[in-house]
Amino acid sequence: MQNKLTKMLNLVSTENDFYKDRLEKNAISCSLDLDQYPILTRKEVQENRYNMFSFGCKSKFFSQQLRRQYSSGSSGTPVNVYWLYKDYYASTLPLWRQRARYYGIHTNDRMVKFTMNAYNITHENNTIHYINDPNNVLTINASLIHNEDEMLEIVKLIKNFEPVWFYIQPFILNRLIRCYQTHNICPPATLRYIETVGELLPSDIRRRAIEFFGVRLANMYGTEEMNGIAYECPHHSMHILTDNVFVECLTTEGTIEREGQGQAIVTNLNNTAMPLVRYNQGDIISLTNQTSPCPCGNCAPIISLIEGRKMDEIIIEGATINTYLLVELIAELNNTYNDIITDFKFVYHNSLNMLVCYIHLTDNKNMWFESVAEDITQLFWKKQETKMELRFDVLPFDPNTETNKKFCVLEVKE
């Protein structure tokens, strides 16, 4: 890991103008000393997304030879991160190695993957959006699952597909178990592993999943910006994937530590096209260095706490609005309008049965507000069941106001 970190710091200090400028502005005397580097914020990545390319990679961006990873997550600040394809696949290898080592899961095993990507999809009642490509991967759109009938259709799809493992969010896993139990349906006999991603895994959902499916379950902590960050071993320790990332934490005292509790500060060790050095991931973690190897044999540091990731839902007349769908609305609009939305949040007013989308546009783009608001509204209803009685509105959002400093994707007010 240390060798890969040194190589990354050498690259950014010699082949990346964005970081060379940061070195000069922060009077960094040793470019290979990570401790001297300042924290990189999501806002900085958002504002400099076309200026962070290493030498030779901007031309690849314009010729569409880079892989784009979009992230808005639970932060409310959307960012794009670009990768060379070879770097992206190298970044996924550490996780695949651990899957094979711990649970016997390989790239050719049949997998059901629940995704939140809902671009260019108009929802129709009881229609399930999925693709089966490559042949061993069934990808199901989870942001457009609104009711029990649609979940039942997914159960039927899974049965016919005969998967070996699920890659699934706890929010969806809980609904899936409930559907199986409600309709007295047996889970697929081929299933032998579940991997939960995207949010916190509550202990009750973990217990229910293991009891119902009778398989091994592991939690994976990762992000679109970094790929895998930490992975749970059979002894329930979340080990850092040290061949992919270097993790620190920003404490409440403002110091950056290699151990302790605070905001996750992550350096990617594989992305040479658009390096992220000391990137503030935003999640609250507890980071522990092991004094002796874990019983699984892994000596890597352990993340024992992850806070700040929770997806909520509103159920209106039997239909479900979840934050995955809301986040994807913003993602699709940003894809259309070239990242015009810089900040967002949703507020549901229970007494008014009204959902409000608050957005903040890039500088000098406020003249586009009405057009963007209209498109958000149309897109929202395309992805919902039209029979639902709900008021929906789009209003301006000031991310700098005192009341908006604590962010959540979906806030519910009485």
Regions found by a protein language model. Give the residues of each.
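Conserved AMP-binding loop of ANL adenylate-forming enzymes
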Residues: 97-132, 144
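Nucleotide 5′-phosphate-binding alpha/beta core
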Residues: 1-70, 75-109, 160-167, 189, ...
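Short, acidic Gly/Pro/Ser/Thr-rich loop/turn segments
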Residues: 78, 119-121, 271-274
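Glycine-rich, histidine-containing beta strand-loop boundary motifs that form or position
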Residues: 83-85, 115, 169-170, 221
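Short, charged beta->alpha transition segments
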Residues: 65-67, 125, 151-154
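Short glycine-enriched loops at secondary-structure junctions
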Residues: 65, 116-120, 171-172
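Active-site glycine/GP-rich loop and adjacent strand/helix microenvironment
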Residues: 3, 7-10, 134-414
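Short active-site-adjacent helix-start/loop capping segments
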Residues: 30, 80, 120-123, 175
